[in-house]
Amino acid sequence: MRHLVTTALAYTNGPLHLGHARSTYIPADIFTRYLKLKGEEVIHVGGTDNHGVPITLTAEKEGVKPIDIVDRYHNAIKADLDSLNICFDNFGRTHSDIHIETAQEFYSKLKENGYIYEKEIEQFYCEKCDMYLADRYVEGICPFCEGEARGDHCEVCGRHLEPTELVNPYCIHCNSKPEIKRTTHYFFKLSAMQDSLKEYIENSPEMPEHVKNMALRWIEELHDWDVSRNIKWGVPIPGCDDQVMYVWIEAPIGYVSFTKQLGDIWKSYWLENTDDSKISHFIGKDITVHHAVFWPGILKGIGGYKMPNAVVSGGYLTLENKKMSTSKNWVVWVKDFVENFSSDYLRYFFMINAPLNRDTDFSWDDFQKRINTELIDIIGNFTHRTLVFTERKFGSTPIVDLNQLKDEDKKLISKCDDTEKLVDSLIREYNFKDALMEIIHLAKEGNGYFQGMAPWAIKNEERLKEVMYTCSVVLKYIIYLLSSFMPEKTALLLEYMNEELDLKVRGNPLKKPKVIFTKVSDEDISRMKENLMKATKKAETKSDEKSKKVKSGEKMDIIDIDYFGNIDLRVGQILEVEEVPRSKKLYKIIADLGDEKRQIVSGLIGAYDAEELVGKKVIIICNLKPAKLCGVESQGMLLAAEDDSIVSLLSLDRDLPVGSKIH
């Protein structure tokens, strides 16, 4: 049986953080190493995703070309993966001739098979920049929480957004308000595959249950998929001069193109007529649907390709029980971690801390505790005691007559065999936590045996040899089973044993062992916590400076008197105030404008009590286009001044009737 293992493509707009390592790369590497350890034919391919708006944005901000950003972060990401001992048979990039050619072949085949069609859509267009604006090129106010938001996502409340949902949208290049225009995009007829995708998911026995459940929920309401974008940087759509393929149709094709780079062997892994191969995709939870629904849909549309056997989806990682944020520097970068600790410690911690399919947290205190009291006090203790005692007493691993072993010796060796079989089964089910727990249990048994036998007190040399032989067998099994999880530390243990990576004890001369597992000190943890807080504070300072610039008007364009004259400002009086459900900031306000009453949604919770607002005369912009905030329509805007945390509504210094115009 052949195995193809793939990892989600890392996006080249930044280096890797611990969340990437936990959900995707470490488990995929453990799985690959283990299959290779068992002598099975397996290749591991991965790479970087090099196209899309975030990369062009970064390039524009830095005044460089997109390829410069791609080159920088492709190399940085590969260095991060190398530092974690993540091994690939090929690590490619989507901005390469073979990938672009393969992606265009896939697209053309989808079109030939009737799965691509044209459709008019509404999209923001900036007159000043003379360009259609992709989602990340538009920013504004989130309609749900009133926080600053991008066209695809609100960092404040975490909601996915469409650009046209933003309140007061503006082009990030020139700050002008874009208009909505109609344009033609290309769509993938995914809805036509609803029944076949459902059948595929339901009949994939190796697909994890949580992935099946998520995929089936999406398939129930399957829609066609916009697969083109009005940008220049990407894989050009065949026959189209002004659009490129959306990254989520072309990036997964990288799994095929990167395998192609290994030669004709790619056919034995990917083509439909090769029944003796399995495909396992390791990904993060946030892109489960893309791999369990969209990607299989593409493969079905092409025809002739094998479907993935398993989509192994790793849960989210929080940091100190808070959502990680790269913009706020609330994150631990891989580079910073490996400069301070062994990468094996991270591999161990992530796999033992929670099942892969569950969300989990990285806490510096928990990390220290698990490494010191579990890994070192159990596994480190047994391996060190066995090596030191055996080397000092015999100089080599003793070889004994197996028929002379006592029942307690045979029982422990039998436990080793049972553990090996159980670990094998668990790893093949992607259950890395329980597999690692079985190895820890075996080390506990070894510690108990060592302590109970008290080899330092045994006077009979033959019996002492039997005891230390038994301990050496346990040690060899631990090294063998742990090697996929902790390749660095087990390589050192194997070097001191002077053995090969298998389950046989040969009696070779031992090397004088040194301490392999060193404890994580309180000083180490204090330093890492301090570094995290410093980085976060630095990000907050930058954010504050940016906010001050916006508030001070540095980004505002000059307008003429005619433009100002188009704004309908009037005196209004607040009649009713109530909190908007599901919002921590918003009031629903009914205001009297003299000739009519208006409903206005405003983020004044925390600045004013509801009772304080009733009866107050305020200035209202009356000709704003209505917008929905948290599902409640707002038909205007109250004018207010703001400085840091202080918000003050604008009012009149003389009493005027409601409806009076402001000039």
Swiss-Prot record:
- GO BP, one annotated term: methionyl-tRNA aminoacylation
Q: Where is this motif: 'HIGH' region?
A: 10-20
Q: Name one GO molecular function term.
A: metal ion binding
Q: Which UniProt keywords apply?
A: Aminoacyl-tRNA synthetase, ATP-binding, Cytoplasm, Ligase, Metal-binding, Nucleotide-binding, Protein biosynthesis, RNA-binding, tRNA-binding, Zinc
Q: Where is this motif: 'KMSKS' region?
A: 323-327
| Cofactor(s) in the UniProt record | Zn(2+)
Task: Kindly list the places in or outside the cell where this protein is found, as annotated in its UniProt entry.
Answer: Cytoplasm
Q: Identify which top EC class this enzyme belongs to.
A: ligase
The answer on whether this UniProt entry bears the keyword Nuclease reads no
Which GO cellular component terms are attached?
A: aminoacyl-tRNA synthetase multienzyme complex; cytosol
In this chain, Zn(2+) is annotated as bound at: 142, 145, 154, 157
* Superkingdom of this protein's organism: Archaea
Q: Which PROSITE patterns match?
A: TRBD (PS50886)
Return the SUPFAM superfamilies for the record. Anticodon-binding domain of a subclass of class I aminoacyl-tRNA synthetases, Methionyl-tRNA synthetase (MetRS), Zn-domain, Nucleic acid-binding proteins, Nucleotidylyl transferase
Enzyme nomenclature, EC number: 6.1.1.10
List ligand-binding residues for ATP.
326
Reaction equations catalysed: tRNA(Met) + L-methionine + ATP = L-methionyl-tRNA(Met) + AMP + diphosphate
Recite the UniProt cofactor note for this protein.
Answer: Binds 1 zinc ion per subunit.
Q: Where in the numbering of this chain does the tRNA-binding domain appear?
A: 563-663
Family stated for the protein in its record? Belongs to the class-I aminoacyl-tRNA synthetase family. MetG type 1 subfamily.
| Subunit field text | Homodimer.
| Described purpose of this protein according to its UniProt entry | Is required not only for elongation of protein synthesis but also for the initiation of all mRNA translation through initiator tRNA(fMet) aminoacylation.
* Listed name of the protein: Methionine--tRNA ligase
Gene name per UniProt: metG
